[in-house]
Amino acid sequence: MISIQIHLSHRYASDYPDPRIVRLDRGHLYTFERPQVNKDQPCSAIQMMYQIDLEYDEWRLQALVSLLAQVVQEPFYDKLRTKEQLGYLVWSGSSEMWGVLGVRFILQSDKATVEYLQQRILTFVRNYRSILASMDKEKFEKNREALIANKLQKPKKLSEETNRYWNQITKRTYVFDHRELEVAELRKITLKDLVAFYDKFMMESGSEWRVLSSRTTGNGSKVTLKADSEKDDGETKKQESSRTIEIKDFEAFKHSMPLYPVRAYLKSKSAAASAKL
């Protein structure tokens, strides 16, 4: 007979420090150049993350970010991959890290510089505003319903459901019905709401515009590519130069910036009581 003894000791809250996320200053584009670890890698890559500040109701904010990621995904891919053929990887979507949300755009290219890739993302985001505002009601509702159906889709594997619950546990939020809460907010969102959200967080003129651009340069030769128009290219570069802050020491940068509060854990204590497994 085999017996196993487990010795338990008391753990203090200080043993589990809450992760804190750097809050970017509004109105700035931060760029960070990551070193290329593979000397034979010809591709350059960039990730631009539009940080979404925590000022809306938690679930409404999540719903707006998810819906924007849904509607922008196909036009972004069509423009930069299909039409401009910028590279192997063209992706956009939402992100969430310890309660702080974002909208991300990722490009990987073996023929364009990271500066050019950054300019194309900024230009796309600016030009997409008019496309979003002119979207007809039927197309908007189709995108919204597709997102709702995806959110409410039952897990195909036990591991999917397990991972979803463990994600809430490891973050210490314990809101196991978060999908239903987000869907309830999605049903309320109108196109006008989404455009207002876009103006505030995605446009350079928005009051809550803040972006982090992480870049790495490949070792392959890059050709000089031309933008859609010289006028648009010049406008983008002018706005970039006046708002861009280069991060040279990432650790020093993190220690010099304000942090978001431990919002997700604090707000979810009251919700945890009503959450159902």
Task: State what each model feature region is.
Residues 1-40, 45-51, 139-277:
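C-terminal regions of mature proteins
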Residues 1-3, 117-125:
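Short amphipathic alpha-helices in soluble, non-transmembrane regions
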Residues 56-60, 112-119, 222-226:
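Short, conserved charged micro-motifs
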Residues 70, 74, 83, 123-131, ...:
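Structured segments of extracytoplasmic/periplasmic soluble domains
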